[in-house]
Every structure is written in structure tokens, then in C-alpha cells.
Amino acid sequence: MKNYLMAIDAGTGSVRAVLFDLKGNQIGCSQHEWTHNEDPRFPGSMDFDWKYNWELASGCVRNVLAETKIDPAEIAAISTTCMREGILLYDKDGNEIWACANVDARSNDEVAELIRMNPDLELELYKKSGQSYALNAIPRILWVKNNMPDIYEKTAKIGMFNDWLIYKLTGVLAVEPSNGSTTGLLDLQTRTW
């Protein structure tokens, strides 16, 4: 019988896997801190190391299962959460090619550029997505275009960190609406990009 639920949270400072019973009681938790590395070429950058951080995330899952001695077959569902506005870019084959944490601050010039291009755009995007430029993906994607054109040209898909966790667990890259809207690219009313 499936008597447990698992949550995997990709937070700003750490990743954790938490196991609950069906009444919501916490049965076990495993957590690992991760770091976001500044690229010395780009002050304010906070790169996300998806290879190493996947080792940490999957290690949390293994650890909580080992500590609680719960058979994975007894888990009814897994949910993921994350730091909002941390983004990953993928190539056409679904490979991660670039990622940054939500605290990445390298796109200040791009925010200014967007405001110069269209002073009303931020308000228009806010009305549709509920997001401003502050931590939004649009200035970061523009930053990649301006500073890493080879990565920009290879980019076929974008996702947030909990989407990445789901992708790593299932092989399916999908974005759920509440997180997709944090990109500033999803209209919450129409659920269209």
C-alpha cells in the first residue's frame, strides 16, 4: 500500500527531501547545502552547478529512504518546490546548458535596456504574469543573448529548478503554471506562453 508522500525542495541555500505519512506527519528529512558559484568574469553572477547539485538532490532522496527504511514503492506521490526565478536553459536534445540561481544579479544592464526599449513592458508583463523584472527570467535570457551568444543560440527550452527536478526524476520536461509564470513569459489568465 502507498502510505507516504515525498517533497523535494530546491531552495536557495540547500536541497532537501522530506517524507510524510498520508496525515501530513513528517517521517524523515535529509538536507544538503549547496553553493552557487560566482563566475569571475561576471560580477554578481550565481551559477547553478546542475551536475553536482543533482548528486546532492538524489543523495537526499536516498538518505531519507535509508534513514526511514521506507520502500520507495510505498510512496504515493512526489512533489517538488524550488527557489522561484532560478532558471535552467536546455538545448534541443534536453541537455542542461546554462543555469543560474534566483539570487543572480548579473542582468542589471539588461533590465535598464528593457526599460529603455519599452517603458511600459514591465507593467504589461506584470498584469499578465504577476512578475516584475526584479528576479524574472526575461532579463537573464537577454543577458545570455548579450554575453553568451553561443549558449543563447543553442537554447531550445527554459525551465525552473523544480521543473528540473521533475525532469531528472521522470525524463519529462514540463512546467507547472504557478512556476511558469515566474518566467514572466506565461499569461496566467489564458495559460499560454
Functional labels for PLM-detected ranges:
Residues 92-95, 113, 117-119:
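Hydrophobic or amphipathic alpha-helical targeting/insertion segments
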Residues 38-41, 109-114, 185-188:
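Short, charged, surface-exposed secondary-structure boundary motifs
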Residues 10-12, 23, 99, 124-193:
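Gly/Ser/Thr-rich active-site cleft segment
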Residues 1-99, 154:
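N-terminal glycine/serine-rich phosphate-binding loop of ATP-dependent small-molecule kinases
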Residues 35-45, 120-125, 174-181:
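Gly-rich Lys/Arg/Thr-decorated short loops/hinges at beta-loop-alpha junctions or inter-strand turns
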Residues 104:
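Carbohydrate-associated surface elements
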Residues 107, 115, 125:
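Gly/Ser-rich phosphate-binding catalytic loop and adjacent alpha/beta segment
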Residues 54-58, 62, 108, 112, ...:
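Generic alpha-helical structural signal
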